[in-house]
Every structure is written in structure tokens, then in C-alpha cells.
A protein has these predicted regions:
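Hydrophobic or amphipathic, alpha-helical segments that drive membrane association/targeting
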Residues: 13-14
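Bacterial N-terminal signal peptides that target proteins for export
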Residues: 1-8
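Flexible, solvent-exposed loop/hinge segments and secondary-structure transition points
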Residues: 21-147, 151-155, 159-174
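Cleavable N-terminal signal peptides
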Residues: 9-10, 20
Length: 174
């Protein structure tokens, strides 16, 4: 009696590929309601000029990766901005609510795609940004405490908020 074996080959990449880790914590609508409960929003997307881009980079010390910024004007004053930064390897999507005076009202982590470092979602860590303005230094390990095991995520969110505060001064403040 003859046995037949079917050989199924798995691609080598399937055997050695790292496991993907991505969690969507909040949609845009949910983040808007968390930061500005009861308010309404008017989309006000911004496309930066090269001069604005350079000015933001100079003011913040952080590179601007995109010319288009997803922004909404909040009824009664304020701004809601969705942004992305790279954690260690993957993008972190977050939202920043700015008061009418350009100070940080609140930040929310919307999508986190890294395997480690999700502790940046901790409310106590995010609260360190409340009240910060473009005049604030926003330095990790100085006025923003680092989280062990989440250093790159902490650094890049801090840099992203710093860049968005400069963005407010240069592109949104009227």
C-alpha cells in the first residue's frame, strides 16, 4: 500500500515574521468627544507651505513629515488635531485638543501599533501635557517624565506635541 504525503511549504517569512500588534483605542469621533464633550467640529484641514514647514521645524526643533494636517475647529474656541508619530517601528496615531489660547487641553492615544510601550495611554502620563504652550520646553526626562520600556514612544509623542504647538503658532493662530 502506497502512502501519499502532501508537502505544504510555508514561506520562510511566515515562520520568522514578528507578530503584528495594533490596537485602535479611539476613533476620531470618540477622541473628539473625550477631549471636547458636547462640542461640534468643523473640518479645517491645513496644507503647509514650504515656508511654514521650515518655520515649524525651526521653532520646534522637530522635523515635519507631512504638509497636510488633519485639523478641526471647535465651536466656542479651540482646535482638534489628529497626528501621527513613529514609535519604535510603527506609527502611533494620537489627537491633541488645544484651547482657544493654544494651550494643550488634552491628548488621547487613538491607535497604538507597537508591541511595547502602550503605557503612554496612562492618563497620568498624558496629563503632563495639559497647559503646555509653544513657549514650554517640552523635554523628555525634564518637564515630561519618561516611562521605562516606552522611551521612544514617549520621546516621539513629546516631539509631536511640541511640533503641533509650533504648528498652532505658525498656521492656526490668527
Amino acid at each position: 500500500m502506497k502512502s501519499e504525503f502532501a508537502f505544504v511549504a510555508l514561506p520562510i517569512s511566515a515562520l520568522v515574521a514578528p507578530s503584528a500588534f495594533a490596537v485602535q483605542y479611539l476613533t476620531v469621533d470618540q477622541a473628539q468627544k473625550a477631549i471636547f464633550p458636547g462640542k461640534t467640529f468643523s473640518p479645517a484641514p491645513v496644507k503647509l507651505t514650504s515656508a511654514q514647514r521650515k518655520a515649524i521645524e525651526q521653532a520646534s526643533g522637530v522635523r515635519v513629515l507631512r504638509d497636510d494636517q488633519q485639523v478641526s475647529r471647535v465651536t466656542g474656541g479651540g482646535w482638534f488635531i489628529v497626528d501621527e508619530v513613529v514609535g519604535k517601528h510603527e506609527f502611533i496615531t494620537y489627537a491633541v485638543g488645544l484651547n482657544a489660547d493654544g494651550s494643550v487641553k488634552q491628548i488621547e492615544i487613538m491607535d497604538y501599533r507597537e508591541t511595547y510601550g502602550g503605557q503612554i495611554r496612562d492618563q497620568k502620563w498624558r496629563a503632563q501635557f495639559v497647559g503646555k504652550t509653544s513657549k514650554s520646553t517640552l523635554k523628555l526626562d525634564s518637564d515630561i517624565k519618561n516611562i521605562s520600556g516606552a522611551t521612544l514612544s514617549c520621546r516621539h509623542i513629546t516631539d509631536g506635541v511640541k511640533r503641533l504647538l509650533a504648528f498652532y503658532e505658525i498656521a492656526l493662530k490668527h
